[in-house]
Amino acid sequence: MRKFIPTERMSKSHVVSVREYADGELEDNSLPLIYRSNWSPGQYTSTGPRTKEWHYPSSYSRGAIGIKALDQGKYARLGTSWGREFEERAGYGMSIDARSCYSLFPVSQNLTWIDVPTNVANRATTEVLGKVTQGNFNLGVALAEARSTASQLSTQTIALIKAYTAARRGNWRQALRYLALNENRKFNSKSVASRWLELQFGWMPLLSDIQGAYEMLTKVHLKAFMPMRAVRQVGQNVSLSGRLTSPAASYKSTCNISRRIVIWFYINDARLAWLSSLGILNPLGIVWEKVPFSFLVDWLLPVGNMLEGLTAPIGCSYQSGTVTDVISGESTITADDIYGWDTVRPATAKVQISAVHRGVQSVWPTTGVYVKSPFSMVHTLDALALFRQRLWK
């Protein structure tokens, strides 16, 4: 995305106007045209409150509109003046102010509001709640099993030490017992090295269990206050077209609009959060999964995701969040034909926009209805795989 100059800038465009008479006389009335080529409404930033352990996010808005290129075109006509024939070539004389070009895009005049498509907005809110559920599952499982994990770690570590001590003393039967292997096992070699290699089949699983238990305990070692974060960004290409009255012209705009939602939350009830992540607290989701061929509906209209989002906040407390809307795009303005003139090349202007607005959200977002694009290749392959899986069950 091109970076625009954040301050205003004036530019100059040369408008040709030359009349050539039949007797060879030239009359040049060309002139420069000054226009505002860059405009920015300025930056808006607010400072979020700060506590001992948390700095709340702040709102801000930035944007700029720039006229990338202005071509006055080429027009020609034949005529007479006081009985003298002439051929005249001229430019359109199009004058554009970057401040008025906001109307070419789905934004407000001061660029602090972006018209995000409803489908994008609903998908972002629904899927970010799904991210919250995934976070609940990962941390909820860890918290719920932390106590048993600690006990398991100590038991396995003691078993490892005892097995190691027995092996060093040559008491292989006792070592096998600690490693939960068959103590009546007969070795093919009497050498200590061969016996040790055969015991690897018992050592390795035990060491793996100890490492896994240790990692789980270190991951769930939480501070008194530790917010988690869920993020989802969704974008869509948008095309617009319309008419202008001054100058008399048509325009076509293409832009990309995206919404990024960030939620900071913390789990205040690990058991409820875990149950919510498993879908146990949402009977509607369970019933929907049992509906025959519901996955075909989910392919286009993800009802399952929307139902899942209804119970995502259970067991969690909302801390803060932001909604960031971004637009970047380009518009082409094409002037209408001029009456009485032949259009050799129409006058055109290319306008670019780049704007971002972030607002602070103080409550949980709510799910909404959205439609997935059925033309995505990955989406289509996923649906075919699901269809085959369900059909051959």
Swiss-Prot record:
Q: Name one Pfam family in it.
A: Phage_mat-A
Q: Does the keyword 4Fe-4S apply?
A: no
Per the annotation, which location comes first and is thus the protein's main one? virion
Keywords noted in UniProt: Host-virus interaction, RNA-binding, Viral attachment to host cell, Viral attachment to host cell pilus, Viral genome circularization, Viral penetration into host cytoplasm, Virion, Virus entry into host cell
The alphabetized list of GO BP terms reads: viral genome circularization; virion attachment to host cell pilus
Tell me, how does this one assemble? Interacts with the host pilus.
Subcellular location per UniProt equals:
Virion
Which protein family is named in the record? Belongs to the Leviviricetes maturation protein family.
List the GO cellular component terms.
virion component
Q: What is this protein called?
A: Maturation protein A
List the InterPro entries: A_protein
Segments for region (Viral RNA-binding): 26-233
Q: What organism is listed for this UniProt entry?
A: Enterobacteria phage fr (Bacteriophage fr)
What post-translational modification information does the record give? Answer: During internalization, MP is proteolytically cleaved into two fragments allowing translation and replication to start.
Record's function text: The maturation protein is required for the typical attachment of the phage to the side of the bacterial F-pili. Binds to sequences located toward each end of the genome, hence circularizing it. The RNA genome-maturation protein A complex is released from the capsid upon host receptor binding. Maturation protein A enters the cell along with the viral RNA.
Q: Which GO terms describe its molecular function?
A: RNA binding
Gene name on record? A
